[in-house]
């Protein structure tokens, strides 16, 4: 089960629409279509569940690309990271131009070789990729990953900086990082930390007696969650060292400290908590990385879907509270989509039939956190459009304050969940031409949504 995830990325352009995929078990197969750029991507996990295809909507035959299939022999082998490059395609859109998949045993790719654009890679250890997210339309516009620590471990990002430094450092805190003490001027001379229990770590660096820098002390409030770092590294007095640093919480950014110069680094992670640091130091701070774990939580409960077995499996679990649901309906439920308060959008589920994708758009807005989704109800029945399907024909959504719907007509077999003291944390089911089945993930309102 998925006990907690960290969202990393995405990298790429802003075209297309949001999507996300989270595997029920380990990712075992990835299919991409490539030609000049990455056209589309799809996934299969160890339970046999298959995602939809993300991207590949350009109708021109010469833009379909060539299929490349990656087989991952889970659980002996597991996916741990990705790398690639992004650039303009046809002079208009920024898309994924090359892509590699990194497991604990080998690297698959790169698929396509593109010399220009912006490259991306994630120096990450002690983690398993449990899903993907980003944007797609005609092509794969952007790509990010959901990461989960290897059991009993945190995830290690980095280090960034140079190879020198005689003194390696490595620590994790049992509480939270409270004080950060930096000596900096034209580079990061040294750094030290103190946790909420008063334990001190460092100082790391600062061994040049003629250049100790200027002290800067930053206090992280206990209401903030320290989630990432950013900075630059480059040449300083003949050494490749960290030249500037920023510390990012869920509330604000502390820094930058010193003057940014050289190569920039950042890691866009969400739903995370920094629990420690690692790196190398000597006269200066030569390199730095972070240990990260998901925010604490007990997970969600899976409630089986209502409907039939047509279409393909899908699932969506929110990072935070669900605040928007969009449904197209006309005779049945054609294609729902979801969004949460962190901005994470699901892919549109169903609606594949180009001649019957629902005439009426319905939007449910939920004012989270004062209002939160607690249950769903609806109906499923046979629906005929040339062929006969059993699909979800009506759907309603219940919050702690109100009921929205039912949307579309009431007919045949009804379903509802008489559950209490809970919050809906996500949805799952089956979809193809229409919404064939739908179920929910629930949790108690005061626990995290991940599982």
From Swiss-Prot:
Domain of life: Eukaryota
Keyword Membrane in record: no
One Pfam family hit: Jacalin
SUPFAM superfamilies: Mannose-binding lectins
InterPro entries: Jacalin-like_lectin_dom (IPR001229), Jacalin-like_lectin_dom_plant (IPR033734), Jacalin-like_lectin_dom_sf (IPR036404)
UniProt activity-regulation remark: Hemagglutinating activity is inhibited by D-glucose (MIC=25 mM), D-mannose (MIC=6.25 mM) and Methyl alpha-D-mannopyranoside (MIC=3.13 mM). Strongly inhibited by EDTA, activity is slightly recovered by the addition of calcium or manganese ions. D-galactose, alpha-lactose, L-fucose, sucrose, raffinose, Methyl beta-D-glucopyranoside and 6-O-beta-D-Galactopyranosyl-D-galactose have no effect on activity.
Alphabetic keyword roster: Lectin, Mannose-binding, Secreted
Tissue-wise expression: Detected in seeds (at protein level).
Thermal activity profile: Optimum temperature is 40-50 degrees Celsius. Significantly loss in activity from 60-70 degrees Celsius, and is inactive at 80 degrees Celsius and above.
CDD domains noted in UniProt: Jacalin
Activity-pH behavior: Optimum pH is 6-7. Low activity at pH 4-5 and pH 8-9. Inactive at pH 10.
GO cellular component: extracellular space
Main location group: secreted
Domain Jacalin-type lectin residues, every copy: 5-149, 154-294, 300-444
GO terms assigned for molecular function: D-glucose binding; D-mannose binding
Location in the cell: Secreted
Role, per record: Mannose/glucose specific lectin. Shows agglutinating activity against rabbit erythrocytes. Displays toxicity towards the brine shrimp Artemia nauplii (LC(50)=177.8 ug/ml).
PANTHER family for the chain: JACALIN-RELATED LECTIN 3 (PTHR47293), JACALIN-TYPE LECTIN DOMAIN-CONTAINING PROTEIN (PTHR47293:SF79)
Assembly description: Homodimer.
Family statement drawn from the similarity comment of this UniProt entry: Belongs to the jacalin lectin family.
Name this protein carries in UniProt: Mannose/glucose-specific lectin
Species the sequence originates in: Parkia nitida (Black nittatree)
